[in-house]
UniProtKB/Swiss-Prot annotation:
<keyword id="KW-0119">Carbohydrate metabolism</keyword>
<feature type="signal peptide">
    <location>
        <begin position="1"/>
        <end position="19"/>
    </location>
</feature>
<protein>
    <recommendedName>
        <fullName>Endo-1,4-beta-xylanase 1</fullName>
        <ecNumber>3.2.1.8</ecNumber>
    </recommendedName>
</protein>
<dbReference type="InterPro" id="IPR013320">
    <property type="entry name" value="ConA-like_dom_sf"/>
</dbReference>
<keyword id="KW-0624">Polysaccharide degradation</keyword>
<dbReference type="InterPro" id="IPR013319">
    <property type="entry name" value="GH11/12"/>
</dbReference>
<keyword id="KW-0858">Xylan degradation</keyword>
<dbReference type="InterPro" id="IPR033123">
    <property type="entry name" value="GH11_dom"/>
</dbReference>
<keyword id="KW-0326">Glycosidase</keyword>
<feature type="active site" description="Proton donor">
    <location>
        <position position="212"/>
    </location>
</feature>
<feature type="domain" description="GH11">
    <location>
        <begin position="37"/>
        <end position="225"/>
    </location>
</feature>
<keyword id="KW-0732">Signal</keyword>
<dbReference type="GO" id="GO:0045493">
    <property type="term" value="P:xylan catabolic process"/>
</dbReference>
<feature type="active site" description="Nucleophile">
    <location>
        <position position="121"/>
    </location>
</feature>
<dbReference type="GO" id="GO:0031176">
    <property type="term" value="F:endo-1,4-beta-xylanase activity"/>
</dbReference>
<dbReference type="InterPro" id="IPR001137">
    <property type="entry name" value="Glyco_hydro_11"/>
</dbReference>
<dbReference type="InterPro" id="IPR018208">
    <property type="entry name" value="GH11_AS_1"/>
</dbReference>
């Protein structure tokens, strides 16, 4: 999934991104980013959790914030999208999550976030569809946490959209050997393992449990929490 987005460049244009669909509700009560074939790009707070949503506008995809920490995504013949709920800023917290994830084609379920200085987009892949993102990235090593083996990879995106506009930046990947949809993810263990393999992080921006899809169909219904 070489072109499987690297973005959420809408971070600098949140107010305009949400203006039309949210005219009828307060920003902190944005339960329905819906009623269109493609949910408009947005980020903000909902029921005490940070959410972020981005798509390239292709196909049909609907993101909905539900009660508490729960969200839902349904997509059909989509382009590229990524979105989910979590926290801002990201930390080494232990994340509990669960729910349902059923991609028909390319898709990821991951703890997903960004840092600045250095600018890094990171993924802890818990499950994926037909494409393993490690297949086109540089293998760095393996470590064990949260009941399974994770393989570590790094890749570089050149002149691609990011939280700071069009930039060149690295992507860090931890990919779980045995896919799952539910469990605990100790993010500090991943951060430590990346550091040990020469993959430093910077100042954290958001950190969400995200659903991502690319030229596929499917649905997910995910909740998140911490210990």
């Amino acid at each position: 999934m070489v072109s499987l987005k690297s973005v959420l460049a809408a971070a600098t244009a949140v107010s305009s991104a949400i203006a039309a669909p949210f005219d009828f509700v307060p920003r902190d009560n944005s339960t329905a980013l819906q009623a269109r074939q493609v949910t408009p790009n947005a980020e903000g707070w909902h029921n005490g959790y940070f959410y972020s949503w981005w798509s390239d506008g292709g196909g049909q995809v609907q993101y909905t914030n539900l009660e508490g920490s729960r969200y839902q995504v349904r997509w059909r013949n989509t382009g590229n999208f990524v979105g989910g709920k979590g926290w801002n800023p990201g930390t080494g917290r232990t994340i509990n999550y669960g729910g349902y994830f059923n991609p028909q084609g390319n898709g990821y379920l991951a703890v997903y976030g960004w840092t600045r200085n250095p600018l890094v987009e990171y993924y802890v892949i818990e499950s994926y569809g037909t494409y393993n993102p490690g297949s086109q990235a540089q293998y760095k090593g393996t470590f064990y946490t949260d009941g399974d083996q994770y393989d570590i990879f790094v890749s570089t995106r050149y002149n691609q959209p990011s939280i700071d506009g069009t930039r060149t930046f690295q992507q860090y990947w931890s990919i779980r050997k045995n896919k799952r949809v539910g469990g605990s993810v100790n993010m500090q263990n991943h951060f430590n393992a990346w550091q040990q393999h020469g993959m430093p992080l910077g100042q954290h921006y958001y950190q969400v449990v995200a659903t991502e899809g690319y030229q596929s169909s499917g649905e997910s219904d995910i909740y998140v929490q911490t210990h």
